[in-house]
Amino acid sequence: PIFGQAQYAQIPMAVVGIVMKFFQIVISVAIGMAAGCIPIVGYNMGAGHCGRVKKLFALLLGAEAFVGVLSLLIVEGFPGQLIAVFGASGESVYYTEFAVRAFRVYLCMIVLACINKAAFIFLQAMGRAFASTLLSMIREVVFGVGLALLLPPFFGLNGVLYSMPVADVLTFFASVVVIGFTWRFLRRDDVA
């Protein structure tokens, strides 16, 4: 492959840095929205308004999904322009082709990444810090790092790109299980 040649070896590193920067911007928005719910969740949990907590969680998931879908549409619809924003307008054809592929593959599950962050922070706000920390560590360390190390020997550079979307999908399923289990312990009767 072309990236095995010395003059092109820096391309994957530069591209992954750009992709990670865009990912961090989107995730920062997702974290900000979820963090804004923390005092509201804490108050309503303390006051016994579990119905409100469930409604807020549904609203938050909808907002996070919207941010994720909007980001995905930008990545899928305008990859060249997105790459140019990060100062890569005069690069080689190999750079541009790889950057477009990297954006589309690495960020194909950004909707789930946003939802996962919301679930982690919401669990923390509900007083379930252990579950929140466990899910976060599973996503970042077990799935994120683990898949980034396991997939490349079998899939090469594509293994690195697919590691995060696969981690997001696996973490999403784990989050669904933990949230479902947590909901069982919330009282069905609402005080207000």
Show the residue positions of the predicted features:
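Short hydrophobic/aromatic segments of transmembrane alpha-helices and their interfaces
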Residues: 7-8, 65-66, 113-115, 125-126, ...
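Helix-terminus/linker motif at the lipid-water interface of multi-pass membrane proteins
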Residues: 1-18, 25, 43, 83-91, ...
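Short alpha-helical transmembrane segments in multi-pass integral membrane proteins
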Residues: 41-108, 151-192
